[in-house]
Amino acid sequence: EDISTMDKQAIPDHTLLVGGFPCQDYSVAHTLSSSHGIEGKKGVLWWQIRDTIIAKKPPFCIFENVDRLLKSPAKQRGRDFGVILACLAQEGYSVEWRVVNAAQYGAAQRRRRTFIYAYRNDTIYGQKMADISADMIIKNGGLMAKAFPIQNIGQITETVIGGDIVDVSDNFAFAFEAAGYMRKGRIYTSKVIEQEEEPIALGKILQKNVDDKFYITNEKMPKWTYLKGAKKIPRTSANGHEYVFSEGPVAFPDPWDRPGRTMLTSESTLNRSTHVVSDPGTGRLRLLTPIEAERLQGFDDEWTNTGMPDRMRYFCMGNALVVPMITRMGRVLDTIIAEEK
């Protein structure tokens, strides 16, 4: 069912609301019918999440987004995340967030994502956290610090966000760091030094002697070599300005002794971001198999083998979360929810 057309009150009551949503334009304006109402851009999923929160008031929420959410848009850094925080504050929630690189916490992929944890202030957990300082919540007392331990935090910077979401959309800007906490509109944020764990090297997840269809043919090798290599290309912008587009080389093949790069939905297609590995059995260059793509994200082998074509299996994995990162948050949240009963 389309979340944008359904009655949010018809959604069953729930303890935890979970969502992943694109980094879109979160700007808002007052509605034409009311100076108190607000209206976001059509098709922006966040507003459906907000409406669900208003209708159902779940005690806990966990959201996921790309790491650039904290710095977007480029012309008003921090506005988009500020709008999200203002919406949650308005509904009586406190918020923790962390930008997590999965490889730093034992995963097989260097994938940076922003995780957002919100909880109602009137929960048992919310009342308990009200007595803990912001720096302690960021360093070791909050859900994020328990799920993703850190060695230390940097200097905390603070700001206050107002309750008028349109004003936040029009005027708010702030340098959000990789970790932070908000309660009742007061924001605290800092850099962190992660307590790094040994990642899984790419070589550990590779299969041997895979099907011939995954190997790069001699005919396509020059194209792959070009895409992966450094290049400088003269270009002309729409207004006639001439410039040189340049990019450095990408490891070709991808090294076995490091975790994989961030997997995209285009994985396995002929493009610069696709992983190319040396097969452990034959030594020939090839693409990842669907099973290896699943392993990069921490899924069980054959998780996506439902009859869908390989192209869609890669697409699903390029869109997925790194499962062990969610497991880490889930274990902490299990304890929190158990104490509410």
Positions of PLM-derived features:
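Short SAM/SAH-binding signature in class I
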Residues: H14-G20
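C-terminal target-recognition/interaction regions appended to catalytic cores
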Residues: Y181-K341
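SAM cofactor-binding core of SAM-dependent methyltransferases
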Residues: E1-S4
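Flexible loop residues that form catalytic
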Residues: P22, V66, S268
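Class I S-adenosyl-L-methionine
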Residues: M6-H14, Y26-F252
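Short aromatic/basic micro-patch
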Residues: G20, F60, L287-P290
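Gly/Ser/Thr-rich beta-alpha loop segments that engage phosphate groups in nucleotides
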Residues: F21-P22, A108, A320
